[in-house]
A protein has these predicted regions:
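Hydrophobic anchor at the beta1->P-loop junction of P-loop NTPases
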Residues: 9
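P-loop (Walker A) phosphate-binding loop of NTP-binding proteins
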Residues: 12
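ATP-binding Walker
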Residues: 15
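Walker A/P-loop
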Residues: 18
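Conserved substrate/cofactor phosphate-moiety recognition/catalytic segment
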Residues: 22-65
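Glycine-rich phosphate-binding loop used to anchor ATP phosphates in small-molecule kinases
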Residues: 58-96
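Conserved phosphate-donor/acceptor-positioning beta-strand/loop module used by diverse small-molecule
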Residues: 97-117
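Small-molecule kinase domains that catalyze NTP-dependent phosphoryl transfer to phosphate-bearing small molecules
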Residues: 122-163, 172-193
Length: 197
């Protein structure tokens, strides 16, 4: 089994990222970190209004710091989910030299993931138009460094988990590479100011 330092899970809202992360956590028995797992913050100085860009940047920088802390302490197969898709392009920059894999979940059956979103527990985001746009962008974009794609269409969550584990355990990540970030237009972002929704 090829242990990784980091396992990133990306994909459209409602496609099964959280379900996969929970399954991987049970399998690898390590740790799972989501970008939204940071302390509550309202502004930097008590008066400055919070912008979407600053909020996302704060979440991203905090996530990277947490991940590097766990890595420094010797954790392996650190599962990372729920990052802004635009940050997917930063993974090969920030984590170069580390053993990581990015699992991009897509669906060639938009109706399947629409139904998954419809049945989301805990009042998760329900926005079918955004989900469709996110998935379409992910289907069009070529894989990045150390990124693999799993089409969830027609698969149960158990089948997706099994496929993900097989990829994680066998894929050998590149540690050294040349990388040029793809155009921003190939990604989506929950930050309205990025203009990628």
């Amino acid at each position: 089994m090829e242990q990784k330092d980091f396992i990133f899970i990306t994909g459209a809202s409602g496609i099964g990222k959280t379900t996969l992360a929970k399954g991987l956590l049970q399998h690898y028995r390590t740790t799972c970190i989501e970008q939204n797992m940071i302390p509550e913050f309202i502004s930097r100085d008590g008066s400055e209004p919070m912008t979407g860009e600053l909020e996302e940047l704060t979440c991203w920088e905090n996530l990277v710091a947490m991940l590097m802390c766990f890595h420094k302490l010797g954790y392996k197969n650190i599962i990372v989910s729920d990052i802004d898709d635009l940050r997917t392009a930063d993974i090969p920059v920030v984590f170069k030299g580390k053993k990581y894999i990015t699992i991009k979940l897509v669906s060639t059956d938009p109706e399947q993931i629409r139904k998954q979103m419809e049945n989301r527990p805990e009042n998760g985001l329900i926005d079918y138009e955004l989900q469709e746009k996110m998935n379409a962008k992910n289907l069009k974009r070529d894989p990045l460094i150390n990124e693999v794609e799993i089409d969830v269409a027609g698969k149960t969550s158990e089948e997706v988990l099994k496929q993900a584990i097989a990829l994680i355990d066998t894929e050998i990540p590149l540690l050294e590479y040349d990388y040029e970030k793809p155009p921003r237009a190939l990604f989506y972002s929950w930050v309205f100011a990025n203009g990628l929704r």
